[in-house]
Amino acid sequence: MFLRRLGGWLPRPWGRKKSTKTDLPAPEPRWVDSSPENSGSDWDSAPETMGDVGPLKTKDSGTRRPPQAAPESSRDTRVYQLGSKRMDSLKKDKAASAIQESARLETGGAVPKLDLDPVDSGGMKNLGVSPQGRLGTTGPEALLEKPGRRQKLLRWLRGEPGAPSHYLQDPEEYLQISTNLTLHLLELLASALLALCSRPLRAILDALGLRGPVGLWLHGLLCFLAALHGLHAVLSLLTAHPLHFACLFGLLQALVLAVSLREPVEDEETADWESEGQGKEAKEQTEGPGRAL
């Protein structure tokens, strides 16, 4: 074995063929013809591979291949990877700035803050991740979660719990708004008809000489009949054009609901102001004797 290694280290140009392709990075192992006819020795007849021979030699000179080629290639790959990671981080920073700008324009100047962690081992930044390892509350998803004016209006119209409305606090009271409105409209119509026909009927009865209890009874009966015929005429007119009067009633009901739903909020605000004023007065009264002492 030692002689075989020694024979491999010694230069023997007549024993094996020299490799002509020395620029290849990793030559494939091949069998060398080391027969007794070529080498002239019996111990050299065993087959051996190029891996046992040692470093390759160039054709022109006996110098070895410089070992700096592999480190240079690995260094180039590392530089390329670092450059690609920096480009990715720059792209993510630009995306984050674009998101902040769009959010600032939508919210009217309020810029949401994105959680930016320090640079990790790969040289990249994590956007929207808190140090505890959980997703931050800020970001495009959080921006989408914030309700806009249209969503608030829809919630207010639907009477949802998240809407700024007091509809769900006392539903029975607010359900009586529409019924009371219809009742008041019919009452106004009947009172207008009665006021319209009361004086003429009273004048007619006085002219006929019907006074006293009999005149009062007749006056009441005639007013009832006149109001009944008047209501029949008005209701027939309303049923002849239901769409137009329904639109008018809807507009009137919307105004009444807007006013009645806004009043409790104002009442609560005034109550809060009054309670705050009373609290300040009580503090001043308690602090007054203390200062005097």
UniProtKB/Swiss-Prot annotation:
Transmembrane segments: none annotated. It comes from the Eukaryota. Pfam families: DUF4661. Keywords: Phosphoprotein. InterPro entries: DUF4661. Residues 85-95, 277-286 have a biased composition (Basic and acidic residues). Residues 1-95, 268-293 are annotated as: Disordered. The modification Phosphoserine is found at residues 34-35, 89. This is Uncharacterized protein C6orf47 homolog. It comes from Rattus norvegicus (Rat).
